[in-house]
Amino acid sequence: MYAIVKTGGKQYKVAEGDLVKVEKIEGEPGSAVALTPVLVVDGADLTSGDKLENVAVNAEIVEHVRGPKIRGMHYKNKTGYKRRWGHRQALTVLKITGIK
């Protein structure tokens, strides 16, 4: 069985036992979180829409990590202006423990 959940402005297809990297969620490693809203649940048949108001995906926070370095640069021609920047997104690794 799988479900599609929305967290951090993105949608993830998850199944029980999966490890998923999502946008940072506050909490200590080892604590439990419930992911809502659930958009789709697929068991014996496909379920979506208003029937999923009481459905949640339970997960456990495994660790907090940082994503890969993204580098960028601003450059203005003929003025000597250059600016380099970098960014590493804060991520949380979740282990999906159940879909209820």
UniProtKB/Swiss-Prot annotation:
Can you state the subunit structure given in the record? Part of the 50S ribosomal subunit. Contacts protein L20.
Q: What Gene Ontology molecular function terms does this protein carry? A: rRNA binding; structural constituent of ribosome
Does RNA-binding appear among the keywords?
yes
Q: Which SUPFAM superfamilies match?
A: L21p-like
Q: Which GO terms describe its biological process?
A: translation
Which protein is depicted? Answer: Large ribosomal subunit protein bL21
Q: Which UniProt keywords apply?
A: Ribonucleoprotein, Ribosomal protein, RNA-binding, rRNA-binding
Lineage, top-rank taxon, reads Bacteria
Q: Which family does it belong to?
A: Belongs to the bacterial ribosomal protein bL21 family.
The GO cellular component terms are: cytoplasm; ribonucleoprotein complex; ribosome
Please state the gene responsible for encoding this protein: rplU
What's the source species for this entry?
Corynebacterium urealyticum (strain ATCC 43042 / DSM 7109)
Q: Which NCBIfam families match?
A: L21 (TIGR00061)
The free-text function statement in the UniProt record for this protein reads: This protein binds to 23S rRNA in the presence of protein L20.
Pfam families recorded for this chain?
Answer: Ribosomal_L21p
